[in-house]
Structure formats: structure tokens, C-alpha cells
């Protein structure tokens, strides 16, 4: 059926309110808002100031991944902080049987006697976050280990990432998707 939700102030306050539907598995695919807003979908902990919030995009056609949360936050913070490749990304498979002798179970060995590592393809913002985690590791190595910025902080890491990001010249930044 069609539900109507009434929201009342318990104190004399004005402002906006936001509603989210539960995740998959708790509602049917037919359950929708009549006038949905695809923005302000970033949730905890990514909607707070400190974390580096990562969106995902398709690196083959430079489109934002449809399930990537969009900003800004309810409190007006500009999020996501950065977008990284997150669609059909190939990488090593976890828990797929690398034997104790260093060979892939049932897979033989790779070139020059190295173990063939089972590969898999994944999609999502977790994949994009892994890209950014690698970039952060490189920044920490450059800044702290190599001595270029020994007082590097979360804020400076975020600033380096944002300043170094490739931007589409047809778009204005910041924006709610990228």
C-alpha cells in the first residue's frame, strides 16, 4: 500500500528532515519514495568531517557508479571527498587456496616458478576505498618516511588527495557526485 509519514516538531525548531529506506533484504524491490532524492545518501561514518569518504566510478567510461552514495551530508559537509575506480576491478582473490608451499591450489605456477595467484573481479565503494588506501600509504611513505612532511595529518592527506585528483573540465567542483 501507500504509506503517509507525518513528522512533527517536539520543540519549536525549523529545518529539514531526511528519511532513508532500510537496506536490501528488509523491504521489497517495489518499496520506493514517490519523490526520491538521490543526494544526501552518505551515511555514518562517512558523513562526518574526519574520515576520507570515497565514491566509486567506472574507469572505462568515467561515469559515477550507480550505487555510490552522493553528498552532501545532512549537515552540509562536502562529501564524498574523492572518487576512485570501483567498477569491475580485477585483483587477487581472498581465501582461494594459496597453498603453504606457495603454489595456488589446483592452479599450477605462474611464470618463472612463481605461484599463480587466483584473481577475481569486484565492484563497489570498498574497491574504490582500497585504491585510496594505497594512495594514502604512498603519501605517508613520501611524507613521513622520506621526510617531505613529517607532521602529515589526516587533514593534510585529504588535502593532497583532493588537490591531486583528476577533474572533468566539463563539471564544476565540488559537486554532489564527484
Regions from the PLM with identified roles:
Residues 1-91, 163-165:
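Catalytic-core segments of hydrolase enzymes
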Residues 86-174:
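Hydrolase catalytic cores
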Residues 176-178:
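Carbohydrate-binding/catalytic loop surfaces
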Amino acid at each position: 500500500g501507500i504509506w503517509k509519514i507525518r513528522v512533527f516538531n517536539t520543540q519549536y525548531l525549523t529545518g529539514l528532515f531526511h528519511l532513508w529506506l532500510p537496506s536490501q533484504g528488509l523491504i521489497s524491490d517495489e518499496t520506493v519514495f514517490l519523490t526520491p532524492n538521490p543526494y544526501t545518501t552518505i551515511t555514518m561514518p562517512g558523513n562526518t568531517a574526519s574520515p576520507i569518504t570515497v565514491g566509486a566510478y567506472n574507469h572505462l567510461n568515467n561515469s559515477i557508479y550507480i550505487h555510490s552514495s552522493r553528498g552532501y551530508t545532512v549537515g552540509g559537509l562536502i562529501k564524498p571527498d574523492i572518487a576512485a575506480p570501483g567498477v569491475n576491478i580485477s585483483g587477487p582473490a581472498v581465501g582461494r587456496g594459496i597453498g603453504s608451499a606457495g603454489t595456488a591450489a589446483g592452479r599450477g605456477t605462474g611464470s618463472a616458478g612463481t605461484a599463480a595467484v587466483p584473481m577475481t573481479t569486484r565492484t563497489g565503494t570498498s574497491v574504490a576505498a582500497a585504491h585510496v588506501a594505497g594512495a594514502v600509504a604512498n603519501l605517508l611513505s613520501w611524507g613521513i618516511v622520506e621526510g617531505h612532511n613529517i607532521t602529515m595529518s589526516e587533514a593534510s592527506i585529504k588535502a593532497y588527495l583532493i588537490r591531486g585528483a583528476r577533474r572533468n573540465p566539463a563539471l564544476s567542483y565540488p559537486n554532489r557526485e564527484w
